[in-house]
UniProtKB/Swiss-Prot annotation:
This is ATP synthase epsilon chain, chloroplastic. Pfam families: ATP-synt_DE (PF00401), ATP-synt_DE_N (PF02823). PANTHER family: ATP SYNTHASE DELTA/EPSILON CHAIN (PTHR13822), ATP SYNTHASE EPSILON CHAIN, CHLOROPLASTIC (PTHR13822:SF10). One of its GO terms (molecular function) is ATP binding. CDD domains: F1-ATPase_delta. F-type ATPases have 2 components, CF(1) - the catalytic core - and CF(0) - the membrane proton channel. CF(1) has five subunits: alpha(3), beta(3), gamma(1), delta(1), epsilon(1). CF(0) has three main subunits: a, b and c. Its main location: plastid. Belongs to the ATPase epsilon chain family.
Amino acid sequence: MTLNLRVMAPNRIVWNSEAQEIILSTNSGQIGILPNHAPLLTALDIGVMKVRINSDWCTMALMGGFAMIENNQLTILVNEAEKGSDINLEEAQQTFDLAQESLNQATGKKQTIEANLAFQRAKARLEAVKANSSSAYN
């Protein structure tokens, strides 16, 4: 049995396929979703989504949004998303390093909040590309 997974950003459908298992980062922690999951509506945090298709795993960096599960249909609405296979490792590492440096040097509440969001986004992209390159699915 499978789940139908659909990931939508404001300007495009990012992903539309069947999957056996999905792991999401929600605002209250990670959740695993299998076929016949109870209906659920949850907010998503900035983080990595892992998708199992047959025996292979692939990843995607999600930049926050919402997920709705009902009748083996998982619909994810995100602000932005990027497949791990589409991310350049070196560029993601550089962006992460710069974001970490900006966070460490941030002064004031607004600058700290903005730097923290940039750091979380960079971290999600880096984790997605690293997890994707270590999996068999590309």
